[in-house]
């Protein structure tokens, strides 16, 4: 049964979607922030299609949960459920440039080949110590504790390195009981601890002056432009929903700065 969603903060409930508990954790953590719906066009609130073969069709649901607050320009969750073909939660907090904050990024992906899982507080301007030092001093001890409990996901491309912090937690896990156990015992609490730190940083953040805000905005645009150009979900979403819908979704919802 399809539940009609009329605005971006209406609940996302997708039967069998594996990342539902993570989204519920995240929304609960935002509960005290007096958030309001972020404007998302109706056609991107929830879409259903089919993939697979004619003899073995697979139902696909892609939904968007999104809000905004005084300090967060956009908080959004891209949720994809496609049975054994894919299960995805991409949860991102885009701060307002009037506050000196990194991005929060949680990318949780299950494919037929395994789980690809990444968490970070991503810098808008990695070379700016005022922007990064106080974040990394608190993030790295958290990263080191969880990193030791997960296999390393492998190197990231050199061109992407300006957009990741030293606390980038990145792992690949196998399908099955071993991976599922690590997701519940390590990845989920790590996700919540990264998010808790981010919200603490936001709570103490104070407005910056106009010059600093413009500087941060330039860095944020470089980040969102890079993410829009290199979005690894582009191929999957195009296969599920077509090129026109996918490009519009990437540029007008996911990375709309």
Curated annotation (Swiss-Prot):
Transmembrane portions of the chain: none
EC number: 1.3.7.3
Catalytic activity entry: (3Z)-phycoerythrobilin + oxidized 2[4Fe-4S]-[ferredoxin] = 15,16-dihydrobiliverdin + reduced 2[4Fe-4S]-[ferredoxin] + 2 H(+)
Span of the signal peptide: none
InterPro entries: Ferredoxin-dep_bilin_Rdtase, Phycoerythrobilin_Fdx_Rdtase
GO-annotated biological processes: phytochromobilin biosynthetic process
HAMAP family the UniProt entry points to: PebB
Family that this chain belongs to: Belongs to the HY2 family.
Protein name: Phycoerythrobilin:ferredoxin oxidoreductase
């Amino acid at each position: 049964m399809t539940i009609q969603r009329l605005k971006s903060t209406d609940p996302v409930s997708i039967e069998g979607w594996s990342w539902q508990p993570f989204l519920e954790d995240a929304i609960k953590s935002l509960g005290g922030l007096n958030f309001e719906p972020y404007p998302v066009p109706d056609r991107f609130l929830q879409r259903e299609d089919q993939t697979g073969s004619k003899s073995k069709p697979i139902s696909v649901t892609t939904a968007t949960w999104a809000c905004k607050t005084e300090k967060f320009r956009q908080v959004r969750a891209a949720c994809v459920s496609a049975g054994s073909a894919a299960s995805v939660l991409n949860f991102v907090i885009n701060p307002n440039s009037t506050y000196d904050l990194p991005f929060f990024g949680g990318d949780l992906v299950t494919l037929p080949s395994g789980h690809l899982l990444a968490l970070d507080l991503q810098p808008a301007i990695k070379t700016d110590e005022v922007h990064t030092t106080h974040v990394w001093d608190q993030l790295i001890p958290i990263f080191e504790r969880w990193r030791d409990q997960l296999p390393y996901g492998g190197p990231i491309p050199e061109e992407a390195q300006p957009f990741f912090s030293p606390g980038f937690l990145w792992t690949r896990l196998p399908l099955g009981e071993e991976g599922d156990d690590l997701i519940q015992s390590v990845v989920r609490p790590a996700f919540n601890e990264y998010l808790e730190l981010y919200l603490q940083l936001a709570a103490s953040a104070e407005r910056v002056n106009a010059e600093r805000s413009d500087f941060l905005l330039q860095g944020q645009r470089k980040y969102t432009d890079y993410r829009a150009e290199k979005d690894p979900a582009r191929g999957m979403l195009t296969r599920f929903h077509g090129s026109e819908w996918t490009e519009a979704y990437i540029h007008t919802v996911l990375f709309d700065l």
